[in-house]
């Protein structure tokens, strides 16, 4: 409820007197002089005028008392000396209290008062009573203003328990009443008496006390006004208590902790260290609201999920019900079958028994017995036959099903058998064709010594169309190489000592049945060509990689072969004296199909050819040129599928005469693809050997064609061992032709492929440069589809080479560059690296070409290569071309390629650098399909003319990067870490990828949203310390009737508006018990109402009501009894309900027996409150609604609808009305009676209600404020009083002067009185106190902070003199009977405003 505001009114004496108002209406407060002067003309001095003494506004109880004082004899009743003594005593108490309060605590500043000291000093004259009262009024006004300001600064509840505050309130109204009394008396008309010494001394004491009060006020003024601006900006209705302030601070701290705990990226704008300003608090609350919104969204999603789950659960329930019904049906059928069998068996037994009895009794003949037995046997046989037939039918069905299944399995087995037979036929055909091709190759590749120049390098024999179980088709090109007999047994012996060990050799037995394994082991040279092909759509691309491996003397590293996935094979075919061609299973070789498919693949996609002019060597023989051109033509026929680009590179061999190439720098390219769970490892190890062979033998024994078909999840490890030998080669072209290695490796999507080429130091002396170039050359063309990553590491150690003919070398190596696939959106990261060396250069052009090649190397993110700095280059052209060869590797889209080029220490003597440079150029054109990007790290040395000496220092530093630092690989989540010798340091970034979409539970835990639930209305209530608006309460109980009522009562400790309970209790009758707890009233539920209406069991209904409601409320049954037994039922009613409440029937008796019945009536009800407004209002509600309203709102206030019923059912409805509202409300008939008998009725009514009130005036008053009465709420508890005091009664209709007396605690003086009509208090909360007819007014004086509601004292005053003490009186009655609130509710109970 809203707090009360203070208003000040001025009296005729220029003394401002405060009057309290509220938005709901006026309370029962003392009347100002102006209001009372309006009614002076209406007052009848002959009648007794009550002086109302109002209790102090304590936090414990507010009780109204009445003290009738005759206005004509006031001067005799109030002796001046005694009154002044009491006032001085109280002023001393107030001063001591204020000194204790304000002497130590200077918190309350206030606005200065304009007051002259001469006004205070003038009061010491004491000429008349009016001047003294005026002074007191001014002083009380000042104190009231100070206290009102204190109330605005958060210490109101301290003063509710402070005696000084109570005294000021009491003193204010006391002075007001004394003024009015003195104004209406004739005492002021007479001459004032001569001043007495005691009076003078008392007045002097009062002046001193006033001066001390002024000092205290000045202390309060000294406080700075800066803090007041913030504090006074608060609303007037805010409860400002120290506990509330502490709770606010605690809540602010909790808010900061909450924000810190739940601070995320979007909430970090709100800092917990901001100053406590309105803006910062707004931001904090906004942040909290955002968190709550997130929680609300999460809750909404959870609710939606719950709805879906509920729907699924209902569906499951329905399905379960259907199944249960079906089960019941089946059980019923089964039971029927069992019953029929039982019936048949029982019938048979009964028949047998009956037949036996008949045989014994009647003595039937044997023929009849035989007939009966035969009939029984027939019946039994029939039953058995029926059962057998049923069983046979069931077995027949089962057998038919089994037969169907067996037929299906047989068909499947047949299909599988046919499939296997067809596969075997295909395999036999492929093997036969392999043998024929081998024979053709043997017949065509016989070469002698130096005549090998005229032998063609390659012959394309056929194309195999391979279809495997997975439905994939691969096309293989079969190349035949000439067979050259070995002329040196030393080479064979050395090479046979180091054999190649691989688990893939076990697979050779399935394909190469005609091969002898010992021949494979004794071969001196190995050339592995791995071909990994998969059937792809025309939009997909295919790469082929060529790898040339020479035989080795010593194998430095063990050969590691990756595990093969299911349906994948790894085939390693050696090329020994007769050339061996390995093919996959189920291959159908057709030369025509090979040609057709070659043409289709050649012209599928737009091709891009890039030609370099070929300059013939001056000293080159024509035969050499022819052989080179043939090899180039063969290599140019390698095509790609759609979306691929073809790039043919023709280098220009420059042939200076004999140049010895001491060391050749080859870069090891490392292409690591980490997309799938596959890895391809290629290790090319070149050990050191010193071998001397003729060219024909060397060339033919080192060619090995590997066709490896692998599908997804295939790991292929190819180790190419290239021995570093010291060779003296006689024939050049034979060596050049046989050194060519074609490695076609095509992996399907998500197949990582890793190639490591390792060439250790070698000391080679080659007679012919072509043979050496081919043995050294390793071309890796690794094609991966989109979504792959290739990392190639190429390492080139120092070598000592002797090359005679460079042209053949350059031309042959140029052939291997034609697996080029340049799809759209290539990404090519090129970081040129230059080695800072101190070489001895003969030809500057060759050096520049080598450097150009080095700068085209691709390294991902910081790849470095640190070469050695002791190398000698004879011709820079050859070196530059060498480097150019290695730079043309393109990685697929969305991937990065790491290329590390290491140029170690070399001593190079180049005979023909042009051929060497072209050799290197051939190796670098490895192009991978997919969406790729080109990143070029430009350098100034991109031309042939620039040498190492012209490089800048920073460009040389780039060449000194180590390959170990380029380990940043970009991988997908599905890739696995690839470990090998050269790439073991590379981290697998796929394992470190964070979760992109965290789950909701993770967000809740990270944001600590699970702790937000604890912040509920109670904590907010403690934080705000405020009562919500009534409109909010109106909506809340209606929407949440079950849970909000108790919460509202406990949280705010206030009486919730009555209208809400009315509406709610009508619509939700089952929640009335909860309403009873909220309003602390006995609520009668519907069950009780129905029980009350039972006429057959009146006694049980009464006891049940007494036990449940804790009130002696007798409802409809008593009404019925009082109709039949008017006299006897009155006593029964009084005993039953514990009160002298005589309803309806007495009203009829009062009309016939006015005098006697009035007294009895007055004794019965103890109150005489008549409300005329109720007559007009109680017209539209039924009987049940009357009880409901009374119990729901906890007041005896029936608003309007009852009177219409009372007119039609006067006897019963009046009793019902009285029971419903719990008050003695006298309706219609007494009002008419009082009007007709005014004189006689006044005294009995005065005795009845405890004060003499004119009926007509009270009616007018109650019309506007029907729910408040001066006397009916006397015994109410604090919580109920708060609800009442938020409304005020218009005092204009009172005919008397009212004086409020608020005594303080004084244990020395006690007043006890026992009324002759006093009876023992009943169990009801409301207690009745009556005085005899000789008393004109009752005064109830409770102790401050000690007296509870429902206890009072009666003081009898003579009509002439009043002798009483203003301080408090001691309570001699027992403990109060009202209910004690819960501790939580008591803390939150606010105190009324004044």
Curated annotation (Swiss-Prot):
Which residues lie within the region annotated Disordered?
345-375, 431-617, 634-806, 819-842
List the Pfam families hit by this protein, alphabetically: BioT2
Polar residues bias: start-end ranges: 437-446, 464-473, 503-513, 521-538, 546-571, 663-679, 711-721, 780-790
Q: Which residues form a coiled coil?
A: 308-340, 383-421
> Keyword Coiled coil: yes or no?
yes
**Annotated Basic residues bias:** 349-362
Name-wise, this protein is Coiled-coil domain-containing protein 7
Q: What is the lineage of its organism?
A: Eukaryota, Metazoa, Chordata, Craniata, Vertebrata
Encoded by which gene? CCDC7
